[in-house]
A protein has these predicted regions:
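Bacterial N-terminal signal peptides that target proteins for export
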Residues: 2-17
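Charge-rich, low-complexity amphipathic helices
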Residues: 11, 127-128
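N-terminal leader/linker segments that initiate helical-solenoid repeat arrays
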Residues: 19, 25-127, 134-145
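Register position in tetratricopeptide repeats
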Residues: 115, 152-154
Length: 154
């Protein structure tokens, strides 16, 4: 056990020395603190029923955006892009949505509005994605993509 602790301590020391050299004399505590800040976000899952409804709305908005096998035809939409957007808007009013579900709905709405070239509602939808992230956890990728899209649209 002592040997294992010694080896672990040696490895930490060597890593610390390498980090000090590579980061220009940054303290080990600063490097470790930075590493602690980048913890994985544990976002809540999307329910299967909501996922199916979102997929149906996405097919209405843009059937070509649905992943499929090579040569497989695009799925047949059961409504117009406007119907898909309305379906998503109705889903955002559900009270039992978690932050991840709500942010994913707004992200898909942003896609729908962008497809229809409705820039003001696209911007509003991306802002709602970020607002959902203030209430609960959303994925870091979704947050960054929303910020990037807002930057490009403004």
């Amino acid at each position: 056990m002592k040997l294992q602790r010694s080896a672990s301590g040696l490895v930490k020391s060597l890593v610390g020395i390498a980090l000090v050299i590579s980061f220009g004399f940054a303290s080990i505590d600063e490097v470790m603190a930075e590493d602690d800040k980048k913890k994985t976000r544990r976002v809540p899952a999307i329910s299967q029923s909501l996922y199916k409804q979102m997929s149906e709305a996405q097919i209405m908005i843009d059937p070509d955006s649905i992943p499929r096998e090579e040569g497989e035809p695009a799925p047949e939409p059961k409504g117009t892009p406007q119907d898909g957007i309305q379906m998503l808007l109705d889903m955002t009013k559900k009270k039992k949505l978690n932050s991840n579900e709500l942010s994913q709905l707004w992200n898909l709405l942003a896609f729908g509005y962008y497809t229809l070239e409705d820039v003001p509602n696209t911007i509003y939808s991306y802002e709602q994605v970020l607002a959902a992230g203030k209430v609960g956890l959303i994925t870091e990728a979704l947050e960054k993509n929303s910020l990037r899209a807002l930057f490009q649209l403004n």
